[in-house]
C-alpha cells in the first residue's frame, strides 16, 4: 500500500520528485507516476491502483496542474474515494485555486528550499500521526477479538 499519491502536471516532475524524496526520508512511501510506472507497464491501471491504495493525495496545485485534465481526473478519483487531499501551492496563492479545491486547506511551499522543506516536514508529521492512529485502531481491534474470541 502506498502512503501518499503525488499528483502533478507533467512539467513539474522535478518538484514531484523533490516532494517524494523528502517524504520517503520521513519513512513514508510515495508514488509519482512519472517516476514509478515501469517501462512496458500499462500506466492507467497502475496509476489508479496506487491512487486507490493511498491514504493521502498531495496535489502539486500549480497553474499548469489546475489546467491539466489528467490532474483533475486524479483529483476527482481522490475525492470520490474519500482520500485526505492536500493542495500544495507555490506559483499561485490558495485563493487562486479552483473553487472546489479551495475547500481543502492548502500548504504553501514558499519560494526557497528551506521553506519548502519545512512545509513538507509538516505534511510528513500529519501523515505519521495518521498512520499511528490507524495502527492503534488495528491493535485495539486485535485485542478485542482476542479477548472476546477466546470466551
Segments the model singles out, each with a brief description of its role:
Residues 17-18, 42-45, 69-73, 99-101, ...:
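Generic recognition of short, well-ordered alpha-helical segments
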Residues 93-104:
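Glycine-rich, charge-decorated loop segments at or immediately adjacent to ligand/cofactor-binding or catalytic sites
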Residues 10, 62-63:
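Short glycine-/small-residue-rich Rossmann-like dinucleotide-binding loops
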Residues 1-56, 83, 136-151:
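Conserved N-terminal substructure of TIR/SEFIR domains
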Residues 85-89:
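Conserved beta-strand/loop subsegment of P-loop NTPase cores
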Amino acid at each position: 500500500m502506498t502512503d501518499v499519491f503525488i499528483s502533478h502536471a507533467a512539467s513539474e516532475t522535478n518538484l514531484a520528485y523533490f516532494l517524494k524524496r523528502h517524504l520517503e526520508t520521513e519513512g513514508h512511501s510515495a508514488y509519482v507516476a512519472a517516476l514509478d510506472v515501469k517501462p512496458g507497464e500499462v500506466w492507467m491501471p497502475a496509476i489508479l491502483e496506487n491512487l486507490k491504495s493511498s491514504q493521502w493525495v498531495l496535489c502539486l496545485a500549480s497553474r499548469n496542474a489546475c489546467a491539466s485534465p489528467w490532474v483533475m481526473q486524479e483529483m476527482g478519483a481522490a475525492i470520490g474515494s474519500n482520500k485526505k487531499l492536500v493542495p500544495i501551492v507555490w506559483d499561485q496563492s490558495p485563493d487562486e485555486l479552483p473553487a472546489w479545491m479551495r475547500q481543502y486547506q492548502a500548504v504553501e511551499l514558499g519560494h526557497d528550499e528551506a521553506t519548502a522543506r519545512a512545509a513538507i516536514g509538516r505534511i510528513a508529521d500529519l501523515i505519521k500521526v495518521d498512520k499511528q492512529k490507524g495502527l492503534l485502531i488495528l491493535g485495539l481491534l486485535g485485542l478485542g477479538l482476542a479477548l472476546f474470541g477466546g470466551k
